[in-house]
């Protein structure tokens, strides 16, 4: 099971995703590809601050289609199990003197509660979070 991080999803939504990412994602069985509602929120928030107009409307429409259609049933929520994992990861990173951004902690906690690998270019954001990390750019 793979949880696609926001940076991977953003690139997949472009007209021409980098071949490393597009190729890696295409090589995976679609039913193993998931994302998190946290990633959905990050993408929609980024689009919401764009100037109003046709471009923003088209991008928001395309992004919503990705989450509602392409990832239908495969957008993972931050639930009670994720909350428990969040607390454990937070405490471990704090003890190690290595703070992790809240959003990245939430994504890691969701992945950990589902036994998923995080697919990201931002490997350092998830190091020490006790989740498997895959960087499609280095595969």
Residue positions per predicted region:
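Acidic, PIN/NYN-like endoribonuclease modules and their adjacent C-terminal/linker elements
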Residues: 1, 108-139
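Short, well-structured N-terminal submotif of metal-dependent ribonuclease cores
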Residues: 1-39, 48-65, 139
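Histidine- and aromatic-rich ligand-binding microenvironments
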Residues: 4-5, 36, 100-101, 122-123
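A generic structural signal for short hydrophobic patches within well-formed alpha-helices
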Residues: 9, 40-43, 83, 126
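Residues that scaffold the ATP/ADP-binding catalytic core of kinase and kinase-like folds
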Residues: 11-12, 24, 46, 86-89, ...
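Short secondary-structure boundary/capping segments
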Residues: 23-27, 66-67, 75, 92, ...
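Active-site neighborhoods of divalent-metal-dependent phosphate/nucleic-acid chemistry enzymes
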Residues: 45-51, 69-118
